[in-house]
Amino acid sequence: MAEQREDRRDGRGGHEGAPEGATEGVREGARPRGSGAGEEEARAWDVLVATARRTVADGLVVGTSGNVSVRTGDIVLVTPSGVPYDRLTPADLTAVDLDGRQVRGTLVPTSELPMHLAVYRHTDARAVVHTHAVHATAVSTLVAELPLIHYMAAALGGPVRVAPYATYGTEELAENMLRALDGRSGCLLQNHGTITYGATLDQAYDRTAQLEWMCRLWLTASSVAGLTPTLLSEGRLDEVAQRLRGYGQRS
């Protein structure tokens, strides 16, 4: 979702768009960085901010749209609602528990918190990236599943599904997303954008970038008049999945 663009760090912003229960303890019990956040959380916050800024620099979001989170233990650090990423500082650390109760910071968490928490509750994710990437969002309006235009769909677990549309920030959207993510590490959100997860923020981000690239590839190939793109079979994709298990450097 495109977060509200009002910079709420002065504490005067309301809680519009935050999920029920997410703002409990914002004034009482929620602690800013330095009065509860340990070194691990501080480092994780720095990486989260860098990743959020990267989504803007790489054109995956505009303004304050999209959101990023990372899990440390049973705490989820998440981008706040409506604050431009280039203005986020160490003092802006925002975190909730797995029930959505705010435990760090005074800024209102992203309105898409239900999606992030649903991913953490139902998968082994340690990081989540949600964007409004242009080509991926365009594809989400055209098909129910991204056609198998490239073998790197295997890196996301198989053919990428499109979660049916639901209003941003709702449990309905989170439920639709979970169904689309079954057996996958990423999906498209109809008329909305992308969501991916991984063991690290780098992995989640790379999956987002790969998904956007595949969507751009399919749109480009299918735009050629009189020709139809060659697609891969799921059997071919399974072969790639096997090879990817041994891909890269090993320690």
Locations of regions flagged by a protein language model:
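Glycine-rich flexible loops
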Residues: 2-11, 20, 24-251
